[in-house]
C-alpha cells in the first residue's frame, strides 16, 4: 500500500497526520510501514526509527516502492511529487479550518485529481461546527471525495512536544473527552485505509 499525504500549503498538518497514521497502521495491521519525505528538516527524524525513514534531497528522485509506505510530501507539485501521487493507492490531502487554507485545499485537490482520483480529505484541528460548515463549502465547490474530521486536541502536540505516542498517551491516561474523540477519528481514517488495502 502506497499512501501519499500532500498539500501545496505549508502548515496544513500533513506531517502530523503522517506520523499518526504511521503508528496506527502498524499497530492495526501488525505490518511495518516506512515513511519517505521530501522535507529536509522534518520533525519525523526524532519520532521514526532511522531504518524506516528516508529523506529525499531537493534534486533527488523519489523512489516508488511496493512495500507499505507513507509519502509525506509538501510544496510545489513538481514532476517528482506528481509521479509519486500518480502511483499512490491513496492520496490524503489535509487542511485546517481557515479561509486561506481551504482555498489552497481546493487547488491541491484540482492538481491531484488530474492524475489520481483516490483522494481522501482530512480536516484537522476542528472546533464546534467547523466540519459541517467545511463539508457544505466542499459540496458547493463540487468536491465529493471521502472527508474525515480530526478535532482540535492535545493528542498530536503531545506526540511532537513530549515525545508520547498515541499508544503511550492511552497507557498513561492523558486523554480528556476532546482527545478521545480525536483518537477515534484518527482510528477511523486508519480503518478506512486498511479497508482499501483489503479491497
Kindly give the residue locations of the regions a language model identified.
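Walker A/P-loop NTP-binding active-site region of P-loop NTPases
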Residues: 2-58
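Structural beta-sheet core signal
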Residues: 34-35, 93, 121-123
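Switch II (G3) loop of P-loop NTPases
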Residues: 63-81
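Short, well-ordered alpha-helix to beta-strand connector turns
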Residues: 66-67, 88-89, 116
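Inter-motif core of Ras-like GTPase G domains
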Residues: 77-98
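Conserved C-terminal guanine-recognition region of P-loop GTPase G domains, centered on the G4
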Residues: 102-125, 131-134
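Beta-strand-loop-alpha "switch" segments that mediate conformational coupling across diverse proteins
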Residues: 136-170
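Inter-lobe coupling/hinge region of RecA-like P-loop helicase motors
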Residues: 159-187
